[in-house]
Amino acid sequence: MSTAEAPSPISGARAKGNTAVKSALVEAAGEMLAEVGPKRLSVRDVAERAGVNHGQVHHYFGGKRGLLEAAMHALAKQHFDESLESAGGAAVPAPLALIEHRTYFRAVSQCVMDGDIDLVMTVDRDDEVSVPLRVLHHLREANPQSDDLDLRAGFAAAAAMQLGWVAFEELLLVLAEVEPGEEAEFQNRVKTAMSQMLGIATN
């Protein structure tokens, strides 16, 4: 039995052709990173979900690590592009934009819990796919006179709020005694509070 239950293969038919095989493997690996993390993820399970022979992982990616890096990069790139679009091209994403990218968030969380920060950082050193790096660069450019340690501390605090909300939204709603019907307005006010930390506008 596979480590995590899921349709296998994801497309409903075996992937064929170089591009299709690579895409299927990357998609399946991204899903499983979010579900079980890098340590428990099995190359055979990924290949089964993707509908390809597990030998293709080594053929296209050189092994498990190469596939994990490709999967994390793909998830981060999607988050980067879509957050940039939703923010109208602004460097700083809209508050709680990460809610729309829970697979990426869960993949990052699983890597951190597995102690594999390096896998996350293969992405977060890349200007082309790292939302945090994009935001930090923007803050430095917009506030050249600011103490850099203060700026980075504010950045980290705001990031922690975003990550914490996505992880614990249901619990936070309970703890804050949010009543049925108040959720949307409450979330809007949370967005306002987060925006004030980075000095950005909310919709």
Language-model features, listed with the residues they occupy:
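C-terminal peripheral helix-coil segments that are non-catalytic and often amphipathic
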Residues: 1-8, 130-145, 167-203
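Basic, helix-initiating cap at the start of DNA-binding domains
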Residues: 1-36, 40-49, 62-69
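Amphipathic alpha-helical interaction segments
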Residues: 24, 107, 153-160
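Short hydrophobic/aromatic patch on the recognition helix
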Residues: 51-61
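Alpha-helical DNA-contacting segments of helix-turn-helix folds
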Residues: 68-75, 83
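Amphipathic alpha-helical packing segments from all-alpha helical-bundle domains
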Residues: 77-84, 117-144, 149-153
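Hydrophobic alpha-helical connector segments
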Residues: 77-113, 155
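Amphipathic alpha-helical segments used for helix-helix packing
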Residues: 98-137, 169-172
